[in-house]
Amino acid sequence: MKKARRGEDLNLRLVSSLLVVVAEGHFGRAADRLFVTAPALSQQIRRLEEQVGVELVDRSSHPVVLTAAGEVFVADARPALEFAVRAMNGLDALERRRARRLRIGFINGAAGSLGRAAIDSLHAEVELVQLDWSQQVSAVASATVDAAFVRPPLPVLDGVVLERIGVEPRVVALPRGHRLAGRTSIEISEIDGTVQVSSDGAPPEWVKWWSVDPRPSGVPVRYGPSVRTMDEALEVVANGRAVVITAATIAEYYTRSDISFVRISDIEQCSIDLCTREGDSSPAVIELRKAVSALGADR
């Protein structure tokens, strides 16, 4: 390893790439997320290692993990990266307020008909941003988006508020050939022992609630492939590798011949919430809040 070039400013883009590699545990998957080739990503991490003067990742490990020095580096570098991202997002949010633009985050199917109606009623220019399940609240807190339509239960971060829009039943997405696929409704015990999708990046409490874990029967929930979005989850379901419990509106949002959505009759309903920053008094956000409140009151 070359001697660290201490006078060189730390490249936060390279730090961000390192965090993706660690999260994925694999250069190829991380490269796919970053829209670069695996060799190019490996060179980026080498460049960062040369800059700090130590090896940060153990490339011989499967999955790829941080070295001891990498653990120390990431612990200190992650807050700096998050601070820089928040600073840039704050400037972007200020510019959007001035231009009366609104950036709204969503996970596929989360907004439902009420959310779509609220968006359609706005006078502000709207940009929609698709979020991973793990980003539903954090994207609002960091000002990556101005608001988001989310699916609780979610951890409430400081400065972020949730407003209930509506509630609806939950359904289970099953591969078309599943023994329960032709039913109009089932009880949760009928899928006890069936493998459920997981999501490593999402809050564990959120994953468990949506999987109805623990089950009333006491049967342990079996978790399978980890996914980040509903699109990924449904691909896993279609391939027969797991099932996913989700909101009834997902069945309206996705029409697929290889998947059946069946209502679960004996579990708690789910909600749709609007997530915004508590102190955000921009005209576009206020307009969105009012639209959501009015539509919710009409139901």
Give short role names for the model-derived ranges:
Residues 24, 33, 46-55, 88:
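Residue cluster at the C-terminal edge of the helix-turn-helix DNA-binding motif
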Residues 51-52, 73-101:
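Alpha-helical linker/hinge and terminal dimerization helices associated
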Residues 47-66, 71:
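A short LG(V/I)-centered, amphipathic sequence patch enriched
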Residues 97-156:
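Central regulatory/effector-binding core of bacterial HTH transcription factors
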Residues 114, 151, 184-188, 193-218, ...:
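Secondary-structure junction motif
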Residues 162-170, 174-196, 286:
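Flexible hinge/capping segments at coil-to-helix
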Residues 155-163, 168, 231-280:
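Beta-alpha-beta core module
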Residues 1-44, 73:
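N-terminal short secondary-structure element
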